[in-house]
């Protein structure tokens, strides 16, 4: 019986969400490293998708760029792609090319052209363990 169940078992990658955010009004111009708290990558992962949400919609399209540090937060560089929340919208979704990250890497994000509007953003980085 156990062998029969094993043959029916389908293994799928389980997605994990790493979430970071910033409280208050979004930046009015390009502003790097905006996360209120840096996010540790908990294990070796392949990042797959991005989602962003805001409590108050921005008056102009706002781009969030994921940034990564491999040196304990000493420096951050753009990584993994961007997600855009369009003018007057509250959510954005993106499917950039996959990126492998390592346990202990730190994630942050930059904001471009927030128009000084929109409030309280959450950035969701979705990935699978590798």
Where are these regions (language model features)?
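A short beta-strand element within beta-rich, extracytoplasmic domains
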Residues: 45-56
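Extracellular carbohydrate recognition
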Residues: 116-122
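Short, surface-exposed tryptophan/glycine-enriched loops
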Residues: 90-103
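Short beta-strand-plus-loop segments that form exposed binding edges in beta-rich domains
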Residues: 109-116
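Short beta-strands within extracellular/lumenal beta-sheet-rich domains
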Residues: 28-43
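Surface-exposed loop/turn positions
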Residues: 45, 103-105
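Glycine-rich, low-complexity segments
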Residues: 1-30, 55-57, 61-63, 67, ...
């Amino acid at each position: 019986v156990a062998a029969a169940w094993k043959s029916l078992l389908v293994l799928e990658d389980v997605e994990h969400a790493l979430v970071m955010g910033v409280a208050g009004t979004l930046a009015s111009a390009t502003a790097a490293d905006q996360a209120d708290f840096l996010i540790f990558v908990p294990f070796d992962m392949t990042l797959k998708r991005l989602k962003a949400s805001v409590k108050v919609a921005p008056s102009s399209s706002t781009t969030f760029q994921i940034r990564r540090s491999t040196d304990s937060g000493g420096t951050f560089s753009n990584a993994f792609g961007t997600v855009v929340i369009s003018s007057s919208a509250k959510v954005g979704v993106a499917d950039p090319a996959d990126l492998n990250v390592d346990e202990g890497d730190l994630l942050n994000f930059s904001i471009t052209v927030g128009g000084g509007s929109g409030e309280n953003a959450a950035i969701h980085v979705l990935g699978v363990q590798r």
